[in-house]
Each structure stands twice: as structure tokens, then as C-alpha cells.
């Protein structure tokens, strides 16, 4: 009966004959006097950001529901033009740019862009996604003064509140960010995507992100906090989506950058792009090599990307993408507190290596049925390998024995599809937006652990015949299956107030099939036990997640938002089957679940300063962590398992001041000051482990402050940043 009601509910939405008023704004961009039509002119909504760009004949077009809108037109080499428009019907608006500036001034162009947003937010609806009532942030890469060549995450993400960031290389090979006290390691607590599709090793069993797109290739980075769990996956951290640059409207364009840095750093980024009638493309090659800032931390990386788009007509487009990454990195090893205080650049691991091969593919269809109905289909897949080799022990200050090394090899094969339908409709005179989507995901991954060679090179081959009694040996296959149904609906109760309820249904089936070896030696080093133990497990679960968001936009300068959503994190391969001398695994380890709550206010005050100030809370049940335990053999180790229930809560804020607009008002000048701060408290509220209840949650930074100035004058730009 419930299924029938649900079907009727969906049909009513599809057949709804109401639609709310949408008007088209269109026109041409000209140069004054010459009547030359200008392409690649950016058209911005001052409240939202980039809407569109003029095509090869200088024409632009977009639809809007707004009755009043402030548009900003920006063309390279020209002074920007700002237009206030009152819209009742389809409107034609031609834009005439005055004589071009004789000296192209990049800082002036960036300063014009900053009059819109330095760090913008996602609109209520974008494409086939809903972001109303959610805490969202967008990093515009063309405005960033970060070191893009080295993917410097501390600079790139400096204005994202509450992020804990750490870097272990000076080329940005891997991104390590965690929000609101979550573990930053390989961004595993975020659902990580590129152009809207998954790029992690395994979204369920191994959500770590080994591939990070080069910042030079990015148009923007979209971040949505824990409320993203309903549309993008169940993680507590939320969504990180890397949006690659769009193809140029020119017939052909090549951009090449070469960068030299300390520690023998060399990077090359070369992109190729063009458009010919209905076909467009964008591709890049990125090469990085360096010695690293520590001993034994040299690396070499090669990354290539292709994107092809074909516009079937003005309503339907097809696109396909291929990404390949290969890199080899020397691993310098960890440091104890004593070692770090003595010399933070030292290394006592010369035989540790990490190698990666990453191949991603994607096919996408976008179709607009009419002004109110949009559809998207995403097919994506991954074929990849990772190899970790080295001397591993539970004490980082232990001297390398120069014996056989521990080798862990992983092979990942997965594919999935995600389809979305978004429909705008009216109900009792009020506009609403309905979204429904489905996702299917299947993976078949393999992991093997055993002895590697005793040499020092990056030899990723097992030496089972040479070292048959090596202690850490296992081999597993992980066939996983996941499908999901999700839906959200924006109810605009007034022009200013909206409610957005939603749900996500998940079916997850994770399996492990394999074995591990139990090997015991006597005091003389003789083998007294060498036993192969079969180990297979099936975990099957299905559940609903629910959420509710609200937004009250009292004015252009002020938007109140609140959201509560359920989250879920399944145990990973590493949680259940990888042997580690530093800790053991509790055999009863199980999934985590909980809630994320946001309450905040954000806005842009007359383009003089933008702000986002909010309170958040993460409620964890069965949080996975570590506790010290004594074992029967007399050893004392950390055990990984469900430590208990925990809560993390705090205040986070970002305020960005345009000091030039406030005090100086010089179009040749760019001067900004920002302060990004978060204050977090945490504790375990329940636990079966003695001495845990009431204690602080580990690795949660109480205070996290980033602040900086950004200065630009004509073709000179400088920035300074402080982190505490």
C-alpha cells in the first residue's frame, strides 16, 4: 500500500501542470565604436555568481525566476559593467563595452570579480541538485592567490571554516582535510567527487581519496557539509566536488605553466581546449617531480585528463571524461614527539614507498525537458591499484632492521550510475522544487598483505617463497553492492522562507572472502605454528536517512539557515582485515551512525564584506576509535573498535572584508582581509570501555584560526596568511 501511495505521489509531481514564472534574459556583447561582438564575456548574478558566458558570436541567454536582478558583465581587458534589471517578461539586454584597456590588468579583473564574491555559496537549485537550507561553500579558483602549482591545500582552503588540514608533501599529491573534528586522512570522511561523480577508491569499503585534481585545472571547488548525506552519500563530513574548467569557446587554446621551487620541485601544467560547432573539449597534462622537504620524501607524478562534450541540440548534451594518474612517492615515515622537537625534517625510513595507478571514466547525459524540468544521468567507473611497501612497526623511533618489508597491494574495480530528475512546480500559488534520484554502485576489490623484498628500491612484488613464515599475511576479495533512492523538495512558504525535507534509502551489502595466516615462533625463532585461517563475512543492511532544512532570506545581505540530517558510515576494509603491528582490530567492530545539525547566518553586505557564522553539532553513535588494551601474550596495544557515543559541537565563522571598497575605492587596487575561526568542544557521552565516558574525543582541535591579507595593485599581487 505504501508503494502505491508513493507511486501516486511521484506521478502527481510529474503531471503537475502548474509552473512558476520564468523569463528569459538574452542579448549580445559589443565593443563600443567597432561593433565587434565579444565572446567569453562572463555574466554574473551579483547574489549567486556566474550564470553563463557569451558564445562565439557574442550572444548570451539564461532564464530566471527573479523579478529584479543585478547583473555584472566582465570581459578581459575592459571595465566591468553592472546592470540593475526589473524583469516582468522576456527581456533583451545588449551590453556595450567602452574602449579596451590598453594594458591588460589581471588584478583589475580579479578585483571586479571580488565585487561579487570571494567565497560564494551554492544557489538553492543548481542543475539537478538542491542546496537550499544547507551550509555550502564555493572556492572560485580564478580568484585564489594560492600556490596552485603545488596544490597548496592550506592556502586553497584557507577560507573554509572549521577544516583541519595537514600536508605530507610539497606538491599536493594527496588531499588531507577533515571538518569539525573528523579525521583528515585522505579526506575519507567526505564524499569526494569530480564533476559530480565519485573518485575515491571505494565509496563504501575504502572511501579514501588518493587522486586529487590539480588546482590549475579547476574552475571551482564545491563543499557541502553533513547535510549532503541525503543526496551524495551518507558520510558525516559531507561533499567535496572538484569542478574542472569548461572548454573555451575559441577554436583552439593552449595554456602551459612551468614552476620551479625549493627542494628541486618542478611542475608542468599544460591544457588544451577548443570548440567547433557542437563539439567542445578540454584536456590537461600535469607532471610533478621533487625531492620533498624531508629526507626520503622524493616523488614523481603524471596526470592526464580528457573531457569531450557534444551538444545534440539546445536541450540535450553528452559528455565523456577519462582521468589517469600515476605516481611514486618515497615515504619518510613518522616521528615521535622527541624526534620532531629535535629535528622535524629527519627521517629514519629510507625503504618505504607508495605507488599508485588510477584510471577513472565517466559518461554523462543532461537533458532539459522544458524550463521547469531537468534530467541528468551519470555513469562512472574506476580501475586502480595502490601499493604500500616499507618497514612498519608500532614504534616510529625504532631503527629499521633492514629485513623483509611489509607489502600491501590493493586492486580496485568499481562502477556505478546516478540518475536525477528535478521539477519546478507551483502548488496553491507557491513555487516548489522537487528532486528525485537513484544510485547504483558495484565494486569488486582485492587486497593482499605479505612479505616484500629486503632491499631499498620500490619493488612491489611479494616474496612469499623467500619469507614463507612472515607474520602479516592475508588475502581478501571484497565484492560490494549498494543502491540508493533519494528525494528532496523545496517548499517556498513565502518569497523569503523555505523548508526542504528529504530522505535517502540505502541498501548496502559488503562482503569479505579470504584468509589470513597465524604464525607463532618460539624463543629461538623456530616456527611452532603456521596456520591458514579462512575468514569470510557478509554484512547486509538497509535503512532510511531523513533530513530537514530551512532558509529565511530576510534581505540580500542576510540569510538564516538551519539543517538537521542523519548520517551513516560503514566499516572499511582497513577496519576489519588489514594487519598492523601498531594496533589490533576488535572483531565486533560495527558501523557508525548519527546526526549533523547546522544553524547559521550568512550574506554579503553591499559587497563590502561577506560572512558566514554558524553553530554546528555532530552526534555520533558507536564512534570508531582506539583504546589501550593488554593482551594474553603480555603485549599492550591500541585496539580499534566502537569506543562509544560522542558529541562534537562548536562555532565556526568566516568574515571577508573588501577594504578597498570600504576605504579606498580604487579599481586598480585589490585589498581584502579575512578571518576564519572555529571553536570546537567534544566528549564521549556513553561507552562500554572503562575510563572513556566524559573524556574528550581524540584529535579534535579546540581552536582553529586562519587569517590573512590579500593585496593587488595593477599586475602585482601579494598575500600573507597566519594559521593557529
Describe the function of each predicted region.
Residues 220, 225-229, 239-274, 285, ...:
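Short strand-turn segments of transmembrane beta-barrel domains in outer membranes
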Residues 313, 431-433, 439-441, 476-619, ...:
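Structural signature of Gram-negative outer-membrane beta-barrels, strongest in the C-terminal barrel
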